[in-house]
Amino acid sequence: GTYYLVFSQGERQFKVPYEIAARAEGSVARRSFTTADMIYLLMPDRFANSDASNDSTPHTRERADRSAFFGRHGGDLQGMIDHLDYIAGLGATAVWPTPLLLDDEPEGSYHGYACGDYYRIDPRFGSNELYREFVGKAHDHGLKVIMDIVTNHCGTGHWWMKDLPFRDWIHQFPEYTGTNVCFS
């Protein structure tokens, strides 16, 4: 049904409708991946390029540059589709591509972990429609698909990064500050 999110500030209120759709029939019976699966993890940009026409697009900032170590190299969904026989032939039962969602950072985001739009496949990989085709063909090969979506961080280009509710909503340092801890 439709529910309303109610936002208020002092005496002012506004409501936003939010629909919760019914589950698709049989979705509760859907099987997930388990310890019995052999999962093939792949980084789409580095895996296989079957459509050079989408390596660089007019609506994304970083251009393909195979000579750049941290640059985009052009792998795409069509390359993944074209190699499903190979993946299944290895004995894999599931395929896990790193994030395929739009990641339009100016550089170094070929890995997909700086999402800018959680609803759209990055056009350098293909389209939402091609993603659905990939999933269907993977299922035809007996492969489950794990969609990698990281919701606890996003790219600097995501709209909510440009409209933070408070300046200290996220950690902001005057210069680059390494925050990862490495153990050897």
What are the roles of these predicted feature ranges?
Residues 1, 33-34, 158, 165:
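Alpha-helix initiation/capping motif
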Residues 16, 40, 95:
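A broad, low-specificity signal marking well-ordered, structured residues that form hydrophobic/aromatic
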Residues 47-184:
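Substrate-binding/active-site clefts of carbohydrate-active enzymes
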